[in-house]
Curated annotation (Swiss-Prot):
Single GO molecular function: peptidase activity
Key words, A-Z: ATP-binding, Chaperone, Cytoplasm, Nucleotide-binding, Stress response
Gene Ontology BP annotations: protein unfolding; proteolysis involved in protein catabolic process
UniProt subcellular location: Cytoplasm
SMART domains: AAA, ClpB_D2-small
Keyword field contains ATP-binding: yes
Name under which the protein is recorded: ATP-dependent protease ATPase subunit HslU
Length: 459
């Protein structure tokens, strides 16, 4: 059991609070959903089959934290996570992505996740193998050779000269190994052999092939043998190039794929954004009919079905689906009834207030102000935000959201980037300490805020 699996829903919310301000209802809903997954794993096989995830529908304007809540939750739980827009899909039979492709993408993410974990486990062993390959390039290993006549009678007589050569070779290698580990040889150039694909033609993936879980480029690539090429490079670069190659040799890909399939099926999270854009009102025609078609294609996946992928069949019964949308024009009730029923948990996220902007700039562990401070610290520039400076940034951002289109917390990015533009450009050729107070913010934004046309383009 991982450390995350021991967390209670309350503790999961506390973890999310470190990165996301407010939205306690949404945090509570996702924490319960994830905890129920952990509870399900402890049940007997008979009960496991009966209990499926309760999918969530998040309703709220852009920039209030819908995606971030789902993304952070996936990171905390170590779950494969895929964010997609519902609008990228088309009904089966039309040109465009079919809804099945989301499952294939999730599995691909899971395979890469497990592969990275396995590669990390064998990293030390792989580093030793890389070391040997580099030493082979510097001083080819000499083998002990036996006298042919002695071989006939099973005798192990060695030529004295060859024994001396072998010992000298070993001594040289050990000396170079010491220098290699200390980094003395990093700038030396060596020639190494690297395997490359020998496929004579480049292939573009066809949607038809993707739909049946086939990757044509992989099929063709497996037909043609891999070609070995010799490349010259510095030892420092060779270490980076050879490490993933040696790591891959040490991991069992069949086991990796099997683990990844289990992970995707039982712990996968798919975040479907812009769900409101595929909602269609009753009696509509044309484009709205196509939207309904996407909903009907989505239904069996959310209900639970088996999708064929290039790694094997994947059951979607236990994947957690989190859908989100602003629902300004349409309503959740405009979705087809069957799909509505598959998202039983509905959470409304609150629009951000001015005080929320203040908290967003200060409280999260990855707060924007802290990000800029860290960036400029690399140039020996100390950036300090005063309380009135933070409040002014929040006030301006909130006001712009009211005046222009409401893009939520994303407004802080544009405002802060504009305020710090000169500092970021001139660093490190400026004074070592920059204080961002209310006057500083006003001075940097004055001309833009006063000109409404300019505001709409720049902020």
């Amino acid at each position: 059991m991982s450390d995350f699996d021991k967390l209670t829903p309350k503790q999961i919310v506390e973890e999310l609070d470190k990165y996301i301000v407010g939205q306690s209802k949404a945090k509570k809903a996702v924490a319960i959903a994830i905890r129920n997954r952990i509870r399900r794993q402890k049940l007997s096989e008979e009960w496991k089959k009966e209990i499926t995830p309760k999918n969530i529908l998040m309703i709220g304007p852009t920039g209030v934290g819908k995606t971030e809540i789902a993304r952070r939750l996936a990171q905390l739980s170590g779950s494969p996570f895929l964010k997609i827009e519902a609008t990228r899909f088309t009904e089966v039979g039309y040109v465009g992505k079919n809804v099945d492709s989301m499952i294939r993408e999730l599995v691909e993410i899971a395979v890469n996740m497990v592969k990275q974990q396995k590669m990390k486990e064998v990293e030390e062993k792989a580093k030793l193998n890389v070391e040997e390959r580099i030493l082979d390039a510097l001083v080819p290993m000499k083998k002990k050779t036996q006298i042919p006549f002695a071989n006939i009678f099973g005798m192990q007589m060695e030529k004295p000269q060859q024994t001396d050569d072998y010992s000298e070779n070993l001594r040289k290698r050990e000396e170079l190994r010491r220098r290699l580990r200390s980094g003395e040889l990093d700038n030396e150039e060596i020639e190494i052999e690297i395997e490359t694909s020998n496929s004579p033609i480049g292939f573009i993936g066809l949607p038809e092939m993707e739909d049946i879980g086939m990757d044509l480029s992989n099929v063709i690539g497996n037909i043609f043998p891999k070609q070995k090429k010799r490349r010259k490079m510095k030892i420092s670069e060779a270490k980076k190039v050879l490490l993933p190659i040696e790591e891959e040799k040490l991991i069992d890909m069949d086991e990796t794929i099997q683990t990844a399939l289990e992970l995707a099926q039982n712990r996968g999270i798919i975040f479907i954004d812009e769900m409101d854009k595929i909602a269609a009102k009753t009696g509509s025609s044309g484009q709205d009919v196509s939207r309904q078609g996407v909903q009907r294609d989505l239904l069996p996946i959310v209900e639970g079905t088996t999708i064929t992928t290039k790694y094997g069949p994947v059951k979607t019964d236990y994947i957690l689906f989190i859908a989100a949308g602003a629902f300004h024009v349409s309503k959740p009730s405009d979705l087809i009834p069957e799909l509505q029923g598959r998202f039983p948990i509905r959470v409304e996220l609150e629009p951000l207030k001015e005080e929320d902007f203040v908290r967003i700039l200060v409280e999260p562990e990855n707060a924007l102000t802290k990000q800029y401070q860290a960036l400029l610290y690399t140039e020996n520039v100390q950036l300090e935000f005063t309380d009135d400076g933070i409040k002014e940034l929040a006030r301006v951002s909130y006001k712009l959201n009211q005046k222009l289109e409401n893009i939520g917390a994303r407004r802080l990015y544009t405002v802060l980037e504009k305020v710090l533009e000169d500092v970021l450009f001139e660093a490190p050729e400026i004074e070592e300490k920059i204080i961002v107070d209310a006057d500083y913010v006003t001075k940097k934004l004055k001309g833009i805020i006063e000109d409404e046309d300019l505001t709409s383009y720049i902020l």
